[in-house]
């Protein structure tokens, strides 16, 4: 459903041509709307015939080697953000979509998976000990910080949104305050919570303490 990316510099022809996508964005701008791209830099397709997994004859030009190469839950490949080639490739990708298609920003997919060595799997993020315990991928955090800096330099009013489950402190703080520079955090747990509550819990059984915990978690 679009999250195992094979070509990072091309929109899928299933939905139209590049010119049609550009025209769609221009039309939206004409109505005063911002167009935010859902950008996937958290992983890539494992299929070597169409993706980057064996681009230079090895499995690790863009990705980790060994145990960290494959994502344990997504059946995909994990970028090695510590490599200059990867950093340049992904930063250039951000700039490409801004310059060539005039997108107004990005919703970064799977940020939790990027910033933790465990990908956030099986973690209960309930305090600072959960965020600062050597389980963080410093290279990924560096990449995301540079990406935010680049995006806002290329397009001053661009918007960046992090899909992030853990509530990492500083995620949406400015660079000058030591943050990663995202404008917003998309807290996926809150929508899921409300959907479940509205569908499954009777009004008279709503618990204020439970709701407060979820909203401030």
PLM-predicted stretches and their roles:
Residues 1-136:
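Substrate-binding/active-site clefts of carbohydrate-active enzymes
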Residues 102-104, 119-217:
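Conserved alpha/beta catalytic core and glycan-binding cleft of carbohydrate-active enzymes
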